[in-house]
């Protein structure tokens, strides 16, 4: 059982956050799982976190569900509240990888509000050529039976990603936290290019 002082230490423990940024199909989820497992970090997918809250009918989940039922987007403040709660878990003691958040500059600035407790350490930007990305996602759609991905829809998503994340990357670049990762090629090679920044 932790002592009073250990509890106080836990409260002030700095869990460093590592952000994985990249367009859909860039392979960031695959690498996040591998890196998290190797270095004892928590892998936090904001999409999974949101679904878990809704499925478990938590207070935050109920708010999120009512917002989504009205066809609205869940607010950044609500996602941050879920994130703060998640980061308080024991598996986050060594730090965490954020997969899917932040996606925009306002979200990054919301994350700054909790930086004294959970500072952002590194931001990995997964870079993939648009045509390579289109082929990857179309191939994935064929093998998984997903037919909702068309070349046009993928290109639109890539364009939105680029527009949203360019200011975000600039924001973290100014803090010297950005590492650009060539996300084309062998999965193990890409993994080692990321892992060397954790050693």
Predicted regions and their residues:
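Glycine-rich phosphate-binding loop of ATP-dependent small-molecule kinases
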Residues: 1-199
